[in-house]
Amino acid sequence: MSFASETKKELTNLDVKDCCTKAELSALIRMNGSLSFSNRKLILDIQTENAAIARRIYTLLKKKYDVTVELLVRKKMRLKKNNVYIVRLVERAKTILEDLKILGEQFVFERNISEELVKKRCCKRSYMRGAFLAGGSVNNPETSSYHLEIFSLYKEHNDALCELMNQFHLNSKTLERKKGYITYMKEAEKITEFLSVVGAHNSLLRFEDVRIVRDMRNSVNRLVNCETANLNKTIGASLRQVENIQFIDEKIGLDALPDKLREIAKLRVDYQEVTLKELGEMVESGKISKSGINHRLRKLDQIAEQLRNGQAVTLK
């Protein structure tokens, strides 16, 4: 089961207050519902491919309105051929839709979110939970990028949902897609805050656990890469220095060098793998700082370069 599916399953098991039931149902029906007429009766169908969400809608309708609700199961004939669950409401459909503040003129759904429906903070949370159950998805935190989104068919509803979410400082944004609109967020911290707001606390803990391990692994990798780069740089510099010292030895001999340069030249050839700091601690005449060692090695590089170019050599 995907992380998104596990999150939705957790949300379908939450208990909700009476006022919050209306908010959650309103989002679920507005986003997944459709209306039709049969024998002059208004029929509401709420469709989903998630059995847990279908049970959730069925249970909330029965609990809130004590009406007869049908649950139909059909098989998709294309692509994955998943089951499609249809929660059908015939009894008092118009009255219930009006109570949920989503039935507009000419029997079409309102595209805005009723302020009366989400007046309380707990109801705002429940509406967001219903919207996520109806059209939401969230990437597995182990994947390369963090992403949570909720899909809406209509721009007005998408904008209203984004505004509602940002009342909780989630920094969500909107984007037009080919067949609708999405409200989304890409910051890991904001995704965990969203999961907390809608009540998916177990999923939040799992997300955070994976994120911490992932961030730690990335930090270790960056540190290793940095250390490797520094090591390669040190080795490269050491090889260049040894090559220059050997060239000087071939051309004029190390004995021609001043004592301070000769001492460092011999140490570098004998201990090619050590750092400048370690090299400075090996000097018999007394410990020399890293910058002091670096200065003398640069002087040796300069002498080698002068010899290669046939220039007069400055030994002091």
Curated annotation (Swiss-Prot):
DNA-binding region(s), residue ranges: 275-309
Q: Where are the transmembrane segments?
A: none
- Which biological process terms from the Gene Ontology are attached to this UniProt entry? cell division; regulation of sporulation
Q: Name one Pfam family in it.
A: HTH_WhiA
Source organism's superkingdom? Bacteria
Q: Which UniProt keywords are present, listed alphabetically?
A: Cell cycle, Cell division, DNA-binding
Asked if the Swiss-Prot or TrEMBL record annotates the protein with the keyword DNA-binding, the reply is: yes
* Database matches in InterPro entries: Homing_endonucl (IPR027434), Sporu_reg_WhiA_N_dom (IPR018478), Sporulation_regulator_WhiA (IPR003802), Sporulation_regulator_WhiA_C (IPR023054), WhiA_LAGLIDADG_dom (IPR039518)
Molecular function via GO: DNA binding
**The keyword Nucleotidyltransferase is assigned to this record:** no
Q: What does this protein do?
A: Involved in cell division and chromosome segregation.
State the similarity comment: Belongs to the WhiA family.
Instruction: Specify the protein name.
Output: Probable cell division protein WhiA
Annotated organism of origin: Bacillus pumilus (strain SAFR-032)
